[in-house]
């Protein structure tokens, strides 16, 4: 059984004029245990909408999503989400931000267990030295590390990432990508990530799923990324297979024509 099953999901919104807009149209996708899937596509095609539906933050207009065999009806501890914004509480230390999530996920656990889980999560992202620092005292990259630690601390079945490195400089982004790969390989967590960065998708993914242009977006194409793991960033830069993936994805994104606006109305 797949860890995550997206079954014939459609999502409609109503604008201020009362007109309906079909954002997603009958999207179906099965994501296997420990698989890393990246969602790509033009801005506004519904990638983040789909991720929010998987997170339980939005309810689909039609269709259903199952996680570990259970139909999703709202947020749950088996799914954790990391956004582009770190979303840390500024009056709490890095440790306290992580502990707050752990306390919610493991209700009734002893204080010693909560402390251990929180500290281990920060250790996982190499932030032992920043455990008592406040968000304003650490860099943007370190804030995102705390966000990732908070997500892994609750031991989710599925990790959802919405452009978590999009606002970071290239070197910090590369470092966090490497950290993410290391942690995912260690924890065997299933990951669904939204990104606009093609190279990031190729480096991280087992599969890259491209949505068609919206409105009424569907799955346009899927690439199976079969380069061997662990992946070497420098070797991938000149690897023939990776270059071919990059070429095909760029061609897809640049040549894809928009669906006429009227086709998205319902």
Predicted regions and their residues:
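Short coil-to-helix segment of the ABC ATPase nucleotide-binding domain corresponding to the Q-loop/switch region
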Residues: 92-101, 202
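A short, flexible loop at the N-terminus of ABC-type nucleotide-binding domains that lies
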Residues: 1-3, 12-26
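Helix-to-loop junction immediately C-terminal to a conserved catalytic motif
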Residues: 55
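Conserved ABC ATPase "signature" region
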Residues: 110-130, 182
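Conserved ABC transporter NBD signature motif
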Residues: 63-75
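Conserved signature/switch motifs of ABC ATPase nucleotide-binding domains
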Residues: 133-136, 154
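Hydrophobic anchor residue at the start of the ABC signature
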Residues: 82, 148
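The feature captures the beta-strand-to-loop junction immediately N-terminal to the Walker
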Residues: 40-42
């Amino acid at each position: 059984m797949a860890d995550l099953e997206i079954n014939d999901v459609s999502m409609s919104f109503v604008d201020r004029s009362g007109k309906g807009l079909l954002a997603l149209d009958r999207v179906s996708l099965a994501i296997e245990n420990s698989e890393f899937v990246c969602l790509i596509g033009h801005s506004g095609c519904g990638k983040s909408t789909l991720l929010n539906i998987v997170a339980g933050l939005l309810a689909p207009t039609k269709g259903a999503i199952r996680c570990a065999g259970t139909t999703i009806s709202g947020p749950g501890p088996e799914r954790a989400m990391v956004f582009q914004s770190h979303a840390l509480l500024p009056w709490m230390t890095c440790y306290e931000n992580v502990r707050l999530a752990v306390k919610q996920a493991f209700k009734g656990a002893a204080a010693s267990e909560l402390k251990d889980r929180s500290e281990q999560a920060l250790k996982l992202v190499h932030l032992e030295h920043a455990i008592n620092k406040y968000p304003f005292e650490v860099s943007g990259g370190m804030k995102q590390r705390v966000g990732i630690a908070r997500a892994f601390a609750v031991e989710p079945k599925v990790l959802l990432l919405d452009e978590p490195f999009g606002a970071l400089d290239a070197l910090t982004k590369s470092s966090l990508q490497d950290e993410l790969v290391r942690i995912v390989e260690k924890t065997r967590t299933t990951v669904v990530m939204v990104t606009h960065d093609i190279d990031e998708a190729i480096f991280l993914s087992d599969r890259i799923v491209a949505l068609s242009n919206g409105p009424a977006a569907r799955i346009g194409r899927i690439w199976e990324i079969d380069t061997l793991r662990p992946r070497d960033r420098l070797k991938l830069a000149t690897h023939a297979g990776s270059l071919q993936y990059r070429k095909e994805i760029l061609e897809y994104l640049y040549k894809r024509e928009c669906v006429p606006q009227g086709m998205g109305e319902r």
